[in-house]
């Protein structure tokens, strides 16, 4: 029964692992719900800033902010939002594949690339893959603050204002639902013109100190809020992916335990049958 003992030991080991993955699944569910609440709370802020920017631009049409001007592409920047931890399925891998594909298109057109990386997994990827990482930040925790991101985002905004990059995009996972997380590359600046629901009605405002100064400040705040929204949404996607990964691991452990239990029962049955045969054979010999 040496084989049966090994099987019993393996079953006990898998049951222990199953308890861990089940606990991690429950923790991920709780964290995902909190991340969804933060995501829902921050989204109206960015949308409202976008509406105000539209009003300000209309109020001062002779002033075109640098963030609204299209330039010939010589160098582009990416803010890459990844996770700090693993065990979240193919979340980061799919994100990096999407990014690498977009980078390849730019390189084919002779466009150089600068990177701002958020998250330990992104930093580790670009250490191996290569790339001009000009700013990096990690370990933002479960409740990231927009103030934690300002320094890294400012590096990219200054590069744009100085003419060192001609476009800035954010690369992150969109939280579609619990089962679906979609890697996306979204252009931040130059600001892409979109039909703005907030401009269905036009009002005349009095701006203090003036519309130009307000627009300058709001444009920077808008980009910061968009990056923050991407970080919060990526965190929700990470927790959803981890929940699914841990559920699959728990289910697979259950299947493996059932298979091993069957093998153990067969081995035990074979051993008992052999012992009975030996006893019967011995009795017949007597």
Swiss-Prot record:
Family to which the UniProt record says this protein belongs: Belongs to the ATPase gamma chain family.
Organism: Pseudomonas syringae pv. tomato (strain ATCC BAA-871 / DC3000)
Any GO CC annotation of this UniProt entry: proton-transporting ATP synthase complex
CDD domains (alphabetical): F1-ATPase_gamma (cd12151)
Gene3D superfamilies in the cross-refs: 3.40.1380.10, ATP synthase, gamma subunit, helix hairpin domain
Chief location category: membrane
Keyword field: ATP synthesis, Cell inner membrane, Cell membrane, CF(1), Hydrogen ion transport, Ion transport, Membrane, Transport
PANTHER family in UniProt: ATP SYNTHASE GAMMA CHAIN, ATP SYNTHASE SUBUNIT GAMMA, MITOCHONDRIAL
Origin superkingdom: Bacteria
Gene name in the database record: atpG
Name of protein: ATP synthase gamma chain
GO terms for biological process, alphabetical: proton motive force-driven plasma membrane ATP synthesis
Stated role: Produces ATP from ADP in the presence of a proton gradient across the membrane. The gamma chain is believed to be important in regulating ATPase activity and the flow of protons through the CF(0) complex.
Any one GO molecular-function label of the UniProt entry: proton-transporting ATP synthase activity, rotational mechanism
